[in-house]
Amino acid sequence: MTHKNSCITLISPQNNKIKNTQGIKITSSAKKQILFLTKKNKKKIKLRLKKTGCAGFKYCMEEVVDTSTNLSEIIFYANDVSIIVNTNELHMLDGVKIDFVKEGLNYSFKFSHTKIKNFCGCGNSFEF
């Protein structure tokens, strides 16, 4: 039996500052894992890009304790899930889809985005 992993879209209440945003899409399994990681300690997730590899970037998620955001950050949220994004990276992170998948014995977050043009040969980085 196949089970389709439904998505929710996180939006920002700051849409008046940022025009034409698509939001951040997360699957139900990603939502469940993010809530598991953040609820107990009331942390939030910060999504960012890290320069690395042969192609240029990779996605990074980190837990942040300080919930006060500064003017250079935007919070996307829906259904008890919050993800913080730096405004300098918004044009590259807006529209990303986050999933939490099992590959062999390991579980990990997987990211997909229509703006990605190329992946490096090893698959560890990409370019827009």
Swiss-Prot record:
Entries under SUPFAM superfamilies matching the protein: HesB-like domain
Highest rank taxon of the organism: Bacteria
Disulphide linkage map: none
GO cellular component, one term: cytosol
Transmembrane segments: none
Gene Ontology molecular function: 2 iron, 2 sulfur cluster binding
Gene Ontology biological process terms from the UniProt entry: iron-sulfur cluster assembly
InterPro entries per the UniProt record, alphabetical: Fe-S_cluster_asmbl/transfer (IPR050322), FeS_biogenesis (IPR000361), FeS_cluster_insertion (IPR016092), FeS_cluster_insertion_CS (IPR017870), HesB-like_dom_sf (IPR035903)
Gene3D superfamilies: HesB-like domain
Record NCBIfam families: iron-sulfur cluster assembly accessory protein (TIGR00049)
Family, as annotated: Belongs to the HesB/IscA family.
Official protein name in the record: Uncharacterized protein bbp_116
Source organism of the structure: Buchnera aphidicola subsp. Baizongia pistaciae (strain Bp)
